[in-house]
Amino acid sequence: MDSTSSLHGSSLHRPSTEQTRTDFSWDGINLSMEDTTSILPKLKRNSNAYGIGALAKSSFSGISRSMKDHVTKPTAMGQGRVAHMIEWQGWGKAPTIQPQHSHEAVRRDTDAYSDLSDGEKEARFLAGVMEQFAISEATLMAWSSMDGEDMSVNSTQEPLDCNYSDNYQELMESQDALAQAPMDGWPHSYVSQGMYCLGSSDAWEASDQSLIASPATGSYLGPAFDDSQPSLHDMGPSQPASGYSAQEPPPLLGVDTDWASEVGGVELARGPVEEEKRPLAPEEEEDAGCRDLESLSPREDPEMSTALSRKVSDVTSSGVQSFDEEEGDANN
């Protein structure tokens, strides 16, 4: 086979040997009709997956560019036109009473929109988009502000609950500590402060816990005074306080109606007989009983005792004070 004839691509006969299998050659590139891979430019005949992937990628890039130029842009313009029509017609607004010839108004609006230039259409489209963004942002800000208010309310309620629980716990602990305190010492302190007036001498016995008044109750209602105890009239001048045991102190002011029988023992020890037998008014007896309780309490300075007695006497009502004044005038 002549080399010149092979360069010009003119072959007169087909050789039978496999070495001269390619019949045509053009610009140094061998072409074979039997090998289809030879049509790929600048690729080997035995092309691998990399070459196929590169071809697919380039093909996809070209196809996507073509789609963008011929399909995407017109579709986007069409969607923009729909958005323009939505904003133009005000479909998102509340429904209003439509006139009889509403289709004519729609047609006029459509014609007016069609008469707009591309710049005006784009401007209207951007205005509509910005309006929607503004509405969405305002809505999100409103929701976030509501969430913030809820969080602030919860945060303010939580410390209040904590403070309430702490105060309640402190109150319970103080009550427990007061209940566990020695019971034989509290009447003296409370009576010295002018807060309590006990009913009978049984309250001073620490052995019987059921008869001891609790500070939380605010008052003491002891058992009824025993009738077997000698009264004021039965006891003579020679028996000042012989009817009572040595361990048991004289009876104190109580809640019974027989005031003279309860205060008699204490008064006999402190004053003459004729002064004790003089009938006392209930108000005077109450003041005398409180003074006796103050004498039983631990002694303090005279000024403090005077202030405490004044505090106890101030508990009486205005009517009682007026009654005392009238009785003093009558005695004078």
UniProtKB/Swiss-Prot annotation:
The keyword Methyltransferase does not apply. It comes from the Eukaryota. The modification Phosphothreonine is found at residue 316. The keyword Phosphoprotein applies. It comes from Mus musculus (Mouse). Keywords: Phosphoprotein. The gene is Fam131b. This is Protein FAM131B. Residues 323-332 have a biased composition (Acidic residues). Residues 1-22, 95-114, 221-332 are annotated as: Disordered. The modification Phosphoserine is found at residues 47, 114, 117, 295, 297, 313, 317-318, 322. Belongs to the FAM131 family. Residues 101-111, 272-281, 288-302 have a biased composition (Basic and acidic residues).
